[in-house]
């Protein structure tokens, strides 16, 4: 029996290693790997990219574009985990749960671009509310997110884990201070916002896991929109989603904190709607593993859809 061949280009980076770990013991796919000495050899990479059924690119943006250019075999399908193609119209955005029928689009796509970690939480919260008309497209969205340091890739992991005292001395590192984070165009486009969202990311002194929050002033929404209606919209949208759940309002009301590490090691995304006592303000929240639903888990979910696994979404 012949099994689909998968080549991970960049399998020694943070995301590539995680994807390899998720696939190495599976019996329904065959992993094509290159010897260590050949991983950066353009000719050998090109051979592998054209010999596989599905290529997963875990590379910097420029290298990912180069890898796509190496592919001459029209049968090869691609999942790109970089941000190189996330706003390109000829690539399918790899967030199966974001819209009805989108898992089908991914399943039949030739080119799939994996979402960024922060956009996964932001789009997961915003898009259903915008589509339902509960949140105006021109709402002034502000997003704050804290990720484990693995979100910074191999360099950040090495800095935190190799004894770099300067890196470990800061319990929180707020960055993107020029307000030009590369995820902003992706969030705006796929959430459906009319304007750029205000986005402030940070790294915490822990390895992985994200908590992302978006404050909402109900007085700026259409008349009659309440926290309960926002929650009902999200709960309905994700009712059949295998990897996304929406906290019941009672659980959200009883919460005293949000643990960014709560879903580590999973491909799950947990959304919440927290309403203050007088009902005038709402805090939308998302908790997930930046290396799971925010990266490698999402890539494997998209791979499963492309291989015909209906249960993947």
From Swiss-Prot:
<keyword id="KW-0521">NADP</keyword>
<keyword id="KW-0963">Cytoplasm</keyword>
<dbReference type="InterPro" id="IPR036291">
    <property type="entry name" value="NAD(P)-bd_dom_sf"/>
</dbReference>
<dbReference type="InterPro" id="IPR000534">
    <property type="entry name" value="Semialdehyde_DH_NAD-bd"/>
</dbReference>
<comment type="function">
    <text>Catalyzes the NADPH-dependent reduction of N-acetyl-5-glutamyl phosphate to yield N-acetyl-L-glutamate 5-semialdehyde.</text>
</comment>
<keyword id="KW-0028">Amino-acid biosynthesis</keyword>
<keyword id="KW-0560">Oxidoreductase</keyword>
<comment type="pathway">
    <text>Amino-acid biosynthesis; L-arginine biosynthesis; N(2)-acetyl-L-ornithine from L-glutamate: step 3/4.</text>
</comment>
<dbReference type="GO" id="GO:0006526">
    <property type="term" value="P:L-arginine biosynthetic process"/>
</dbReference>
<dbReference type="InterPro" id="IPR010136">
    <property type="entry name" value="AGPR_type-2"/>
</dbReference>
<keyword id="KW-0055">Arginine biosynthesis</keyword>
<protein>
    <recommendedName>
        <fullName>N-acetyl-gamma-glutamyl-phosphate reductase</fullName>
        <ecNumber>1.2.1.38</ecNumber>
    </recommendedName>
</protein>
<comment type="similarity">
    <text>Belongs to the NAGSA dehydrogenase family. Type 2 subfamily.</text>
</comment>
<dbReference type="GO" id="GO:0003942">
    <property type="term" value="F:N-acetyl-gamma-glutamyl-phosphate reductase activity"/>
</dbReference>
<feature type="active site">
    <location>
        <position position="117"/>
    </location>
</feature>
<dbReference type="GO" id="GO:0005737">
    <property type="term" value="C:cytoplasm"/>
</dbReference>
<dbReference type="Pfam" id="PF01118">
    <property type="entry name" value="Semialdhyde_dh"/>
</dbReference>
<dbReference type="GO" id="GO:0051287">
    <property type="term" value="F:NAD binding"/>
</dbReference>
<dbReference type="InterPro" id="IPR050085">
    <property type="entry name" value="NAGSA_dehydrogenase"/>
</dbReference>
<dbReference type="Pfam" id="PF22698">
    <property type="entry name" value="Semialdhyde_dhC_1"/>
</dbReference>
């Amino acid at each position: 029996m012949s099994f689909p061949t998968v080549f991970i280009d960049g399998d020694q980076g943070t995301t590539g290693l995680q994807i390899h770990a998720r696939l190495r013991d599976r019996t329904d796919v065959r992993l094509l790997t290159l010897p260590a000495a050949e991983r950066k050899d353009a000719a050998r990479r090109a051979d592998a990219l054209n010999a596989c059924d599905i290529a997963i690119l875990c590379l910097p943006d420029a290298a990912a574009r180069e890898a796509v250019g190496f592919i001459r075999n029209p049968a090869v399908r691609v999942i790109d985990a970089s941000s190189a193609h996330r706003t390109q119209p000829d690539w399918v955005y790899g967030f199966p749960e974001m819209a009805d029928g989108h898992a089908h689009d991914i399943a039949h796509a030739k080119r799939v671009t994996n979402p960024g970690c922060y956009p996964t939480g932001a789009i997961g919260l915003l898009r259903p509310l915008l589509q339902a008309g509960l949140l105006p497209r021109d709402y002034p969205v502000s997003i704050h997110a804290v990720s484990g340091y693995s979100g910074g890739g191999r360099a950040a992991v090495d800095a935190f884990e190799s004894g770099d005292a300067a890196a470990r001395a800061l319990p929180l590192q707020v960055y993107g201070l020029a307000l030009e984070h590369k995820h902003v165009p992706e969030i705006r486009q796929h959430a459906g916002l009319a304007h750029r969202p205000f986005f402030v990311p940070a790294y915490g002194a822990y390895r992985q896991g994200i908590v992302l929050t978006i404050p909402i002033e109900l007085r700026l929404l259409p008349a009659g929109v309440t926290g309960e209606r926002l929650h009902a919209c999200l709960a309905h949208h994700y009712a059949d989603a295998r990897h996304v759940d929406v906290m019941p309002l009672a659980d959200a009301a009883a919460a005293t904190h949000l643990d960014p590490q709560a879903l580590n090691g999973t491909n799950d995304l947990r959304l919440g709607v927290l309403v203050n006592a007088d009902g005038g303000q709402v805090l939308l929240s998302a908790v997930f593993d930046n290396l799971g639903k925010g990266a490698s888990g999402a890539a494997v979910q998209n791979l499963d859809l492309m291989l015909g696994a209906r249960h993947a979404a």
